[in-house]
Amino acid sequence: MREIIKPRSHCSGLVLYHCYEFGHAALRPARMALDSCRLLLNPLNPLTYTVAGRSAIAACEVLERATRRYARPAFGIKSARINGRWVQVQEQMVWHSPFCHLLHFKRDNRGAHGEPPLLLVAPMSGHFATLLRETVKAFLPHRDVYITDWQDAREVPLSQGHFGLDDYVDTVSGIFRLFDGNVHVLAVCQSAVPVLAATALMEAAGNRSVPLTIMLAGGPVDTRISPTAVNDLAKERGLDWFRQNVITQVPWPAPGQGRRVYPGFLQLSGFMLMNLDRHLQSHRAMVAHLVRGDSGSAQRHRKFYDEYLAVMDLTAEFYLQTLKAVFLKHLLPRDLMTSRGRTVRLGEIHHPALMTIEGEKDDITGSGQCRIALDLCTAVPAAHKQHYECPGVGHLGIFSGRRFRTEIVPRLARFMHTHDSRRPGGRPAGLATLRRRRDQPRACSSRAPRARLAVPWSLTFSDPKRVLWRRSSARLVSRRLT
C-alpha cells in the first residue's frame, strides 16, 4: 500500500502552507486588537448596556474567532454518572507511538464491574479524537473506555519516519493484541476500513486477539454504494490532482517541518463548504445572541466551534493511500486490498460479532456504504450481525447529539452486553494483566506473570529509517502501562 509521492513540476502546492502561516502571522496584531475589545465587557463600562456597544463587541469577537488558530482541546472528563451516582474518571495514557496515543478513561472502582472495555478507534480525517468527547461520555456509564488519540502530523518530527495506511493497520492490530481479545471496538467513520483490515489479517493468521465485537459507525466500506459529494469529488479529480494541489510541506518552525502533509485547514475548508449556509447562519445567530445578551446560547456556539475548528494535518502518504484504496479503487470490498504484502479478505472474519450504524441523512458516508460490511463478512453467523439506521440523523449525529444518546447508545450497549461472555478464556477487562502492581518490586520474580510485548514487531520495524529496538529495550513498553 506504499504510495510513492511523486515530485512536482511546480511549487505552488509546496508554498501553500507557508502562505497560510504568513497570513496568520500578519493578522496577529489585528487579532490582539480585536481581543482587547473584551475589556468593553466590563460591567463598569456603560457601553456594555447599550445595543451599539454589544454589537461592536459581537463583531470583534466573531472576527477574532474567524482568524484564530484553534489548538487541540482537552477531553476534560472528570466524572461519570453510573447507576444514579457520580464516580471519578481518570484519563491515562497507557501506550504511545509517534503518531498515536492510547488513552484510557478509567472509572472509579465503584463504577467498574469487570466488563470488557470499549475501544473507540477515532477517525484520522482531520479532526482530533476530542471530537468524540460526547461519545466517550455516553459509554462511561456502561464500561471503561479507551480511545486512539491520533497525533497532528505537523507536530511529529520527520526523523520519526512515515505513517501510511499500512502503519495505521499495524497500529490497530498492535492495540488489539494489548487486550488479548477481551474488548469491544467501535470504529467511527474512516477508521472502519483499517479496523476491518486489521481484524481480517489477524483472523487469517490464526491470531485469537481479535475483538469480541466490531461496531462500525458511518464507515465508508464500499463507496460505490449511494455515492455522496465527497465520493464524486474524488472520482472527478483523480489521485494526481490531489497529489499536486493539496499536498504541501510543513513550514518552519513546526516540529514536523519538511514533512509532506495534507493540511488540516484544507480539510476544514472542505467540510465547511459542504454546509456553508448552515455555518453562516450559525455565526449570524451568535452575533444576535451577543447583542441580546444571551450568554448561554453564545457559549454553546463557542464550545461547538472550538472543537469543530481545531484540526490536524495528515501525512501525505496516509491521505493518498486512503484516497486510492477507499474512494477510487474500492479495494476492500473487492478483496484486493493488501497490507505489507498480505491480501485482506473480509471473508476471513468469523469470531467478532458485527454491527453497523448509519444515519439516514448522512451526507459524507452514503446509505448502505457501511451496512455492506455485514454482507462482505460472510463467515460471521447471521445471529451475530445487526444493523441500525437512525432516522433523520446526519454524519455527526451517529456519534454525538441527543439522538445518539437516546437511540444509538442503548442499542450498542445491549449489543456489547449480549456478547460480553461469548468467548471464554480472555484476560480480565482492560490492560490489567499488563500493568505492574505498585506494591510489587520492579525486578521480575518467578511468581510474577511475565508481561507480553506491548508493541508488535511490525510496528517497530515498519520503517527502515527507524532505530531498531533490542528485545531488552522492548520490555520498557510494558512499564509505560504502569
PLM ranges: what are they?
Residues 1-51, 181, 198-317:
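Alpha/beta-hydrolase-fold enzymes
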Residues 155, 167-183, 196:
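Conserved acidic catalytic loop of the alpha/beta-hydrolase fold
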Residues 363-369:
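Conserved alpha/beta-hydrolase "acid-adjacent" motif
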